[in-house]
């Protein structure tokens, strides 16, 4: 209570107070904005001065610091966000996506791994909880001991830390027009998005989720959704829910047509959501913590930030890639069955003897993530087919303050008939999450 009475006015005087302030600010932001993907950022970087100050004064030991960090992690997991059942079911409960990252390069290009980096890893060992969503940055000159510490934590089965490769992430940010010094200071947002702490806008992802597996399913059925019977974009003039593709090139062109159609719609939905959020959910407290917001006299949702970079949440690129490869290989190259036979097998959910034979062939087809170049290339093609669309998309905040304002790519599940099947081949079973292999 003594700390709470003074520390926000005079600033943190100790490592303990610094952790308290970090946690309080985190909680206030969650309360203001319904608690989704508010992240601690580069905790080991901005807390290092207080840690070293207290160690030098003799008022803190490494063991004390570990206890404080561990307690902060436990307190973070005491928070909750009530979600719809659909989200709870497919997101393993009630995740908050409160990302905390350690390690990696500093803005000056030097390695930033320090004692706090290791203490945070040890704290996650002790907690063994799903939150904070723990990440680690690494690069070619990262200390081997740091990479090994991360590997040992991953080996426990907790699934963390998520590993972010600096050379790759920094190059991606530079390609968006982010200055190198800021790009080197990036941190993960929520799960896999990257951004510049204290300078990014109000969200890293779009307000829409586009299930690419569903897009492929609709494409294969000539614009019909087989679950509802609704038809949105006919590919041919035929009323039949089937397209008799003659070769892979025709199939690929159809994919690009449908991807653009649904991506365009999702950007329009984003704009509708953004216009409402700017009026009804301004986030004044969070806006005060972002550079240029006060200078521009705008909230985050009006463009009060340095960089306004958002992405779509695109579900299942590997599902699409695996499916396209299976069709390319088994229908067009090996001619083991026809497109019509494949769709018939999916419609009866692989239950008949003939369908099970087709399913067996589909399951044996190469899958993304197994170092098989032909299918991996098709998955890469799927990614690039979306990247080619992004230059046409703008946010509502472009030209209203941010120095960089654009769309980029992100990659989240329910699809019925998609011919990628390994364990996932049947209707209403789960597909892979996000951009993960099946």
Residue map of PLM features:
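Conserved catalytic cores of very large enzyme subunits
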Residues: 1-432, 436
């Amino acid at each position: 209570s003594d700390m709470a009475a003074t520390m926000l006015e005079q600033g943190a005087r100790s490592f303990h107070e610094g952790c308290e302030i970090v946690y309080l600010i985190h909680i206030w932001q969650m309360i203001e904005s319904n608690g989704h993907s508010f992240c601690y950022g580069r905790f080991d970087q901005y807390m290092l001065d207080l840690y070293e100050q207290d160690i030098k004064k003799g008022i803190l030991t490494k063991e004390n610091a570990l206890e404080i960090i561990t307690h902060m992690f436990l307190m973070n997991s005491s928070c909750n966000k009530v979600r719809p059942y659909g989200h709870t079911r497919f997101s393993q409960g009630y995740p908050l996506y409160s990302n905390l990252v350690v390690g990696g390069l500093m803005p000056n290009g030097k390695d930033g791994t320090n004692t706090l980096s290791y203490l945070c890893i040890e704290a996650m060992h002790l907690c063994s909880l799903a939150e904070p969503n723990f990440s680690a940055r690494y690069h070619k000159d990262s200390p081997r001991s740091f990479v090994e510490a991360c590997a040992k934590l991953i080996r426990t089965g907790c699934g963390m830390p998520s590993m972010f490769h600096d050379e790759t992430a920094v190059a991606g940010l530079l390609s968006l027009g982010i200055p190198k010094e800021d790009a080197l200071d990036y941190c993960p947002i929520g799960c896999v998005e990257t951004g510049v702490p204290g300078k990014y806008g109000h969200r890293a992802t779009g307000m829409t989720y586009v299930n690419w597996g569903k897009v492929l399913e609709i494409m294969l059925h000539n614009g019909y959704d087989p679950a509802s019977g609704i038809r949105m974009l006919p590919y041919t003039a035929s009323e039949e829910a089937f397209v008799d593709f003659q070769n892979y090139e025709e199939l690929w062109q159809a994919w690009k047509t449908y991807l653009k159609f649904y991506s365009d719609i999702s950007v329009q939905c984003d704009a509708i959501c953004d216009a409402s959020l700017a009026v009804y959910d301004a986030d004044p407290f969070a806006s005060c913590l972002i550079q240029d917001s006060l200078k521009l006299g705008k909230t985050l949702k009006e463009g009060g930030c340095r960089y306004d970079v958002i992405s779509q949440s695109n579900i299942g690129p590997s599902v699409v890639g695996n499916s396209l490869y299976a069709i390319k290989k088994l229908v067009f190259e090996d001619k083991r069955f026809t497109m019509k036979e494949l769709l018939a097998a999916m419609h009866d959910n692989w239950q008949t003897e003939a369908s099970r034979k087709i399913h067996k062939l589909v399951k044996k087809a190469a899958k993304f993530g197994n170092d098989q170049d032909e299918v991996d290339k098709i998955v890469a093609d799927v990614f690039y087919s979306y990247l080619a669309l992004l230059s046409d998309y703008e946010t509502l905040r472009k030209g209203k303050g941010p120095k960089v304002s654009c769309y980029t790519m992100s990659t989240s599940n329910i699809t019925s008939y998609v011919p990628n099947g390994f364990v996932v081949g049947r209707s209403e079973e789960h597909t892979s999450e996000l951009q993960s292999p099946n």
